[in-house]
Amino acid sequence: MPNSTIALTFDFDALSVWFGYPNTTPAMLARGEYGARVGVPRVLDLLQIHHLPATFFIPGHTIDSFPHAVASILEAGHEVAHHSYAHIDPSTQTLDEERHDLERALDALRRIGVQPLGYRSPSADMSPATLGLLETYDFRYDSSLMADDFRPYRPRIGDRVSQQEPLVPGRLARLWELPIAFEFDDWVHFQFNFNPYRNGTSAPSKVLEIWIAELD
């Protein structure tokens, strides 16, 4: 495998990952708490062993619920970025709801001394207003979209798309896009749950094969 530059990012959703479904039974919430109790310490240990920096996208709800886990991320020197307040898909919100959610999460981040440069949308989706709001609040980058694989690009605001007419491109946003890909998301491969059903029982060796092939 040739030398590659890799951006390591972690979505520390904890309990909030279930709010958008919604599915907040004790069993599901316990699975979310696993991230704070077990997942984050193990990830931080691994990053320290290999001297790797990373970015953690953290909902405000997680910041307020698990302050010690979030503090350990900051103490280790990693970037903390915006990931909404309660992990609700922005495409399901009104403009006022989305703005309130964005501001509430910013308040949570500022309480721990973070003025975020980056944003990642919950559920890997956006409303037509999301990128414009990110500009208004002076974000430098987004990491939610998939119009490229490894190269940063500037996303567009105000595209017009319909079944009857070809794409009419909007203007370039002032912020940069650091694209994501579902095949690199461990949730897709490993998370098993009944409701909504997700058969996340992949063999780690198979997932590693996929990731190495993508990097090659």
Language-model-detected regions and their locations in the chain:
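Active-site beta->alpha N-cap acidic-glycine motif
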Residues: 1-79, 132, 209
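Surface-exposed, active-site-proximal loop segments in enzymatic domains
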Residues: 20-28, 86-96, 190-198
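Active-site-adjacent pocket scaffolds in enzyme catalytic domains
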Residues: 110-114, 120-216
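An active-site-proximal "capping" alpha-helix that borders the catalytic cofactor pocket
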Residues: 98-112
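Short, well-ordered coil/turn segments that N-cap beta-strands
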Residues: 2-6, 50-54, 75-79, 110-117, ...
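A cross-domain feature marking catalytic cores of carbohydrate-active enzymes
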Residues: 10-12, 56-60, 82-86, 120-123, ...
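Acidic-and-aromatic substrate-binding clefts and catalytic sites of carbohydrate-active enzymes
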Residues: 32-37, 55-67, 88-98, 120-129, ...
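Feature marks short, surface-exposed loop/turn motifs that line or immediately flank catalytic pockets
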Residues: 14-16, 62, 88, 149, ...
